[in-house]
């Protein structure tokens, strides 16, 4: 896979371009007198060291860019890599099937679970079909329908959060966007089965929270979770989206900061350079965390599960 490099990764991109050029020359002419393999190996080591140096000191704005990386794994990528026998379920049984939310039954290490997650697109047509990962009310109602089904069949629920936010269009508002989100918040707090939520990319405001009330909340290392985008915050406070880096730092949107504030449980480490560099590696780490979370929750009775979730919600914020 050809990698897309972000602005702050340009020194790495230049090194990788040199490596690609040398590799191409080596393939074209195997009779060269110089030892290209040694030079390529040296440059690869230099690239890894440079990547390690850059990623050791990332700011919140750079992490926000990584969370939006176009090659970052999405919900269906994790379904393919970490689960078996996925059977997608569609529709809210009231209006339509929102493609920005995907869901269905799968097996996690042989155990049936209900998966629900935001889904963005990669190509232009797919992005439009998925509405860039911004759900309408019917998407959240579909999610709730699947959660209620999981509760009936005593299946744990696993959600993947990756959205800029709920769709703010006129049609979505007319069909009850705020009501759909609020209902999900209420009903998720009452579910009698384990609910594990993981932010895999962008965790945008109420659009993320609508599938984010759980017994365990995890974040990938380079994901973000916030009430508004850094650009939106900057536009309100400083009347300029150019102040987004400053807003990102002030908002505390990164996984380590949210862990420090006790808003999430676990930060799942990503491969060097981000999840898009090695999707199989991050999928294995995510699967291991989900299995560990399920093991912790399986020992709780339904009453204890609900009490624990209630206390979790009551502990948010300051009194």
From Swiss-Prot:
Pathway: Lipid metabolism; malonyl-CoA biosynthesis; malonyl-CoA from acetyl-CoA: step 1/1. It is found in: Cytoplasm. One of its GO terms (cellular component) is acetyl-CoA carboxylase complex. It is an enzyme of class 2 (transferase). Gene3D superfamilies: 2-enoyl-CoA Hydratase, Chain A, domain 1 (3.90.226.10). Component of the acetyl coenzyme A carboxylase (ACC) complex. First, biotin carboxylase catalyzes the carboxylation of biotin on its carrier protein (BCCP) and then the CO(2) group is transferred by the carboxyltransferase to acetyl-CoA to form malonyl-CoA. This is Acetyl-coenzyme A carboxylase carboxyl transferase subunit alpha. It comes from Enterobacter sp. (strain 638).
